[in-house]
Amino acid sequence: MKNILGGKGAGLAEMTAAGMPVPQGFTITTEACTQYYADGRQINDEITADIFEHVKGLEKITGKTFGDNENPLLVSVRSGARQSMPGMMDTILNLGLNDEAVEGLAKKTNNPRFAYDCYRRFVQMFADVVMMVPKSLFEVEIDKMKEAKGVKNDVDLTAEDLKELVGTFKKIYEDNEGKPFPQDPKDQLIEAVKAVFRSWDNPRANVYRKMNEIPYEWGTAVNVQDRKSVV
């Protein structure tokens, strides 16, 4: 099972089967990763359709909906190779947030500041990890905002401050990518899965594999799970 689901995915499957309280989700197999590379670093239509079918299942189980302004589904997207490779590959958190879902998160938690903090972090993480927009561009804007508001720490920024930062971050994204920040969570998900697959071949992962004699051909699985701790 570990060969197909990766170490993390196999562990999650075993815990779920044992009735342990594990956040709901699904695993995209190592075979999908090797197919991604075989197809010229593209996720083919069959795998895409399969991913979206599992998203529907996750929505049904959780009662949440991707992009919903009342009860949004937010997920984490994490790598999971057969053999543990700590810190070598990429993770994306709170995927599913957009201009509608952030309002749903604010209402559901009764905490707009928390919602917009999650959103600005997601935009920055997605831009950095998925699209390789330099993280420093966002950090500069955070520092500018804190200076303008006369505060020293991120936690001192208000919900309105963070909402303004979201707009600034989305503009940075569009200026660098030549297109708006994706509002469709399904588009976000496919791009995030590609990023995790790509990270199997990043320089630090390649060095780690060589040092630990992990075959390149294994590929990595991707674990998509409900962010139960958020909403």
Task: Name each model-derived stretch.
Residues 1-223:
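N-terminal beta-alpha lobe that positions the nucleotide/phosphoryl donor
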